[in-house]
Amino acid sequence: WNVYRLPTLQKLLNEFGIVPTYLLTYPVVRDPHAVGILREIFAAGECEVGTHCHPWNTPPYEEPLNAYNSMLCNLPVTLQFEKLQRLHEAIQSNFETAPVAFRSGRWGFDAEVARNIIRLGYRIDTSVTPYTSWAQASGPDFSRFSPRPSMFTEHLRAERDSNHMLAEIPATIGYLHGDFQACAELVGRLRRAPFCGFKLGSLLSRLHLLRKVWLSPEMETPAIMMQLVRQMRSQGYELLNLVFHSSALLGGCGPFVRSQADEHAFMRKLHT
């Protein structure tokens, strides 16, 4: 299982003094061997543990299995909370600490999910993907969000410098050229009539003139990621949130790393 490769990853992260947050699903915390690996790293103070909830593999199993219900934000609020609570308690039992960081599976996050995790004592969410909409997958639209950390207000609208209780640390996503917000607005205009039929946004992206980039070794080369980092710094962004799935640690476990050669290439990306 890919989680069994975590010691190799952790050794690399330790070389750079990086303390990662491992966001755990219900199947992981029900696997004694996986928990043993994680507890050893956690006990050494080398990582934090948080919560990553996929509805389809987190009890109670009451909803029909379909694409719509794979987004946590689409479930009834009570069922959302029950799943979150079960996963939260399983992590707390295994690690003797209450997790405070959360990411919704498939980025399925909204105000109701935020309220539910606040009820459970979470202080950090990292479910927002700036300049990205999941509407075609029955998910949320984050196209108006920036990668800048913010605090949710009591009405759960992201506003920076508020003193309310849930911090949003978005995945680091931005553009390689120009002001991020201006690029996002231009992309939005190009997707509407009369421009949408010409697919200008896709053309400009391929030419790297309007390219959106994730800070993720699953999706980008080290050179492209470093270009994004430089853009972030030049625009005053002070925090980076690099993301990837643990399935990338084992060839054949996911769509991004399909072979042992891909696996070795992925680790080289991280080292670079």
Residue spans of the language-model regions?
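Hydrophobic faces of well-ordered beta-strands that scaffold small-molecule active sites
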Residues: 20-22, 49-53, 100-104, 124-126, ...
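Active-site and substrate-binding clefts of carbohydrate-active enzymes
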Residues: 208-272
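Active-site beta->alpha N-cap acidic-glycine motif
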Residues: 1-44
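Generic structural signal for well-ordered alpha-helices
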Residues: 6-10, 35-39, 81-88, 114, ...
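Short glycine-enriched loops at secondary-structure junctions
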Residues: 53-59, 245-247
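CE4/NodB-like, metal-dependent polysaccharide N-deacetylase domain
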Residues: 10-15, 19, 76-106, 161
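Surface-exposed, active-site-proximal loop segments in enzymatic domains
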Residues: 60-74, 252-258
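Active-site-adjacent pocket scaffolds in enzyme catalytic domains
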Residues: 104-233
